[in-house]
């Protein structure tokens, strides 16, 4: 039951906030902001500690992580102390931002977090459920790999899907964290994954938006309240990332992006104003943060810098046009901001996969359709499943109102530019045909409109919150001005309370719109095991559940990973010849894969079977014919079915676990 996951979620919250809070203290992040930046810093500590431990050969565990993290925190504190002693002016704990009381965005985050947590629970169906997607076999198998090998390093985790399990880079921030929950709390891999999904969507995402809200100059309290409160009205995040892929690392990365952008907002303000006292603290926090984001998912870094780029350009323009600055001051500040721009462009250019990985997805909409869906948040519709969900008209209207509000006030116009820029990238991915331009613009997101659709939610939430808060504040001002002069103060005081309630009510109602309900239902279908499930149906799960009772721990099961059997490693803790659908089976199994039916006449087959203890073959169904071009690689296995080479051991419907009995006496 969900109640049984409460201790797991509480542990995850402590793990996500505790180490990062300590690092925030070491870096002298202001106390009022520290908790909201803590998760970003925690995931940096988790991923970097895993690399350090992997290099030293020390097994990954909660104790080893805490030990390395403590050393890293102490090193950061020591650096700040040394600099503060030598140059006190560079070690200030005062950061720029706004003067909105923290209670305002926190109150909004409590409501928004609760709504998204409830929505996400409905999306993932249950605490023991798992995503019926091909990529999820990698994510779940990676947790088993970490537990078995004691190595959680991003430098080696790619071995999970490598033919001979040779080390390869794969950003492991998500998997490192899930493995700590799994190994420490004694739960299942599926439940540890679901708990981390709930943490990312329902807690880290609104918390990250609080950090961002407190960084925006001249933001009004009602707007700071509305920004994290309104997130329940946007189903594309987390919904699309939970449905497609499945894209767990992107989910976590996007949840942390607002807090990293908030760091960049503060950094740009410091450089614009020449207030360098907080520069060291901000720069170190940004370096730690970018390490955390990159090791969760590199395109989270690209997403953050794309969002922040208009702000940096606006900062350069302000410095150049300023009449109050001397020429030397302009050059220094412009140079500092120019370095930030170079970093942004470098991230966008270099943090992208190869062309083959980036050129998979086709456009699904016309440019006009894509523009309409962007403006009214019908982002779930641009997919290969041809969904026709209702757009989020309320959220879209509030975002447009927020853009109009900023234009009218001539304030924070860079937020509109960020919204337009990210929206343009989504339109490119959803509507522009394959080619060099499409690759140039959206390759960091694999040209995948799902990833960019989920990213569009971030600027849309900001504008919708600003629009809602600005509208309610304008309504309050209009009412107060029409009250008798002696009663205006009382009307304004009472009205502010009413305005807070109104903002929260509208934010709550936004989560009840048809688009949210339709998306939630569609996502939940992907987490159910039924007789017609697309990756693992009930018969296949029956076979997998019996495997630990039949197959000895040290044996290997011959399989075709495209049929869902790749999940056996994570769910049944037994080794396979193929752990992922893109897995290239090791040449050491060549005779088995191609000549299994000839095991009684071809001695090489039984030699491999006995040498590698590959005494079993599992045959499941590939219901949707995933990877049709790859199926020829497994024809040799299918040809052995019905011969005297194989003996059925357990069956559920047509799904069968076989013993390669022809080799038992060889």
Description of each model-found segment:
Residues 45-48, 116-124, 149, 224-243, ...:
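Membrane-interface helix-loop junctions at the exits of transmembrane helices
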Residues 7, 56-64, 126-132, 239-252, ...:
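Membrane-helix boundary/interfacial segments in multi-pass membrane proteins
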Residues 213, 393-420:
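Hydrophobic, aromatic-rich transmembrane alpha-helices
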Residues 1-3, 135, 244, 248, ...:
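Transmembrane catalytic cores of multi-pass membrane glycosyltransferases
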Residues 38-51, 108-117, 167, 196-316:
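Membrane-embedded helix bundles of polyisoprenyl
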Residues 1-98:
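Membrane-embedded, hydrophobic transmembrane alpha-helices
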Residues 11, 17, 484, 503-666:
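Extracytoplasmic
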Residues 111-255, 523-534:
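Active-site lumenal/periplasmic loops and adjacent helix-entry segments of GT-C-fold
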């Amino acid at each position: 039951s969900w109640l049984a996951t409460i201790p797991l979620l509480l542990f995850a919250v402590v793990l996500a906030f505790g180490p990062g809070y300590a690092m925030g203290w070491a870096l002298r992040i202001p106390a009022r902001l520290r908790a909201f930046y803590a998760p970003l810093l925690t995931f940096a500590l988790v991923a970097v500690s895993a690399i350090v431990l992997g290099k030293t050969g020390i097994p990954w565990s909660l104790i080893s992580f805490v030990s390395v993290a403590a050393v890293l925190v102490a090193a950061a504190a020591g650096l700040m102390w040394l600099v503060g002693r030598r140059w006190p002016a560079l070690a200030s704990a005062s950061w720029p931002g706004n003067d909105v009381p923290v209670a305002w965005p926190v109150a909004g985050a409590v409501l928004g977090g609760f709504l998204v947590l409830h929505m996400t629970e409905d999306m993932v169906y249950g605490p023991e459920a798992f995503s019926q997607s091909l990529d999820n076999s990698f994510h779940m198998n990676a947790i088993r790999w970490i537990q078995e090998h004691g190595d959680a390093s991003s430098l080696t985790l790619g071995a999970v899907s490598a033919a001979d399990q040779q080390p390869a880079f794969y950003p492991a921030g998500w998997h490192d964290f899930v493995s700590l929950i799994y190994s420490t709390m004694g739960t299942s891999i599926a439940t540890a994954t679901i708990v981390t999904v709930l943490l990312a969507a329902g807690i880290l995402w609104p918390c990250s938006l609080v950090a961002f809200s407190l960084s925006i100059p001249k933001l009004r309290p009602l707007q700071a309240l509305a920004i994290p409160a309104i997130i329940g009205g946007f189903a594309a995040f987390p919904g699309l990332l939970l449905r497609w892929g499945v894209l767990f690392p992107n989910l976590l990365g996007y949840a942390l992006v607002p807090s990293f952008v908030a760091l960049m907002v503060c950094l740009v303000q410091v450089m614009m104003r020449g207030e360098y006292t907080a520069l060291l603290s901000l720069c170190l926090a940004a370096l730690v943060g970018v390490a955390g984001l990159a090791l969760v998912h590199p395109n989270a870094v690209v997403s953050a810098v794309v969002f922040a780029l208009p702000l940096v350009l606006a900062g350069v323009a302000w410095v150049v046009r300023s009449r109050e600055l001397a020429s030397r001051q302009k050059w220094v500040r412009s140079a500092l901001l120019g370095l930030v721009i170079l970093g942004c462009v470098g991230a966008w250019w270099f943090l992208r996969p190869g062309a083959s990985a980036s050129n998979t997805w086709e456009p699904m909409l016309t440019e006009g359709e894509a523009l309409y869906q962007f403006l009214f948040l019908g982002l779930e519709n641009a997919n290969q499943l041809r969904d026709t969900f209702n757009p989020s008209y309320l959220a879209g209207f509030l975002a447009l109102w927020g853009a109009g509000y900023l234009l009218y006030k001539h304030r924070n116009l860079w937020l509109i530019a960020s919204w337009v820029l990210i929206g343009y990238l989504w339109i490119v991915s959803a509507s522009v045909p394959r080619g060099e331009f499409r690759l140039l613009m959206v390759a960091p997101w694999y040209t995948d409109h799902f990833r960019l659709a989920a990213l569009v939610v971030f600027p849309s939430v900001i504008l919708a919150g600003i629009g809602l808060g600005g509208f309610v504040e304008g309504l309050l001002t209009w009412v107060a001005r029409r009250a008798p002069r002696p009663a205006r103060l009382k009307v304004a005081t009472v009205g502010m309370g009413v305005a807070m309630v109104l903002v929260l009510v509208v934010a709550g109602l936004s989560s009840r719109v048809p688009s949210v309900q339709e998306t939630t239902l569609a996502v939940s279908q992907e987490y159910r095991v039924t007789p017609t499930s697309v990756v693992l149906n009930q018969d296949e799960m029956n076979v997998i559940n019996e495997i630990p009772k039949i197959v000895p721990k040290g044996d290997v099961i011959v399989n075709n990973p495209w049929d869902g059997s790749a999940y056996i490693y994570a769910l049944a803790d037994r080794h396979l010849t193929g752990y992922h659908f893109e897995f290239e089976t090791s040449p050491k199994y060549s005779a088995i894969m191609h000549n299994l039916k000839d095991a009684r006449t071809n001695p090489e087959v039984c030699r491999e079977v006995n040498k590698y203890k590959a005494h079993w073959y599992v045959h499941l169904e590939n219901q949707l014919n995933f990877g049709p071009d790859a199926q020829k690689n497994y024809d040799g296995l299918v040809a052995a079915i019905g011969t005297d080479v194989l003996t059925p051991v357990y069956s559920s419907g047509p799904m069968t676990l076989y013993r390669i009995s022809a080799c038992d006496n060889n």
